[in-house]
Amino acid sequence: MHNISLPPGQFDGPHVAGLFTNTLDYSFHPWLERLRPLRVSAHFFVRRDGQIVQFVSADKRAWHAGISTFRGRDKCNDFSLGIEMEGTDVLPYTDAQYAALAQLVPALWSRYPLSAVRGHEHIAPVRKTDPGPAFDWRRFGEVCGLPARVLPRI
């Protein structure tokens, strides 16, 4: 689980999709220029209104985790699915986003052997802070019907 908004704190625009499809208009906002060297992607993006956008097949690798480690294994992109939430670390996520996750995550769970769900903050704690304190892990687990053992300790 990650969060993203481009430019930071702005929602509903085309910029996240542009970043994940390498079509971002860097001239739109000066802040976006710093993203030019990045080549990133995610499997899924959940907008504030609950719309789910898929960028990469869940059967393929996406470039969402960066330098990361989980349970002693490096390169989390090689063995994980990336869900990006439109948001920030501190702005509460929307009811529509949790409802979307309640549809998406069980569908993924039924098809893939998911052993854990973690945030960027858990797999790259020195570099990343998302999805941040605004993400309600208990609520997420409840709406998705996930056993506590797959969630981070809260």
Kindly label every feature range from the protein language model:
Residues 74-79, 88-154:
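Basic/polar, cationic surfaces and motifs that engage anionic cell-wall
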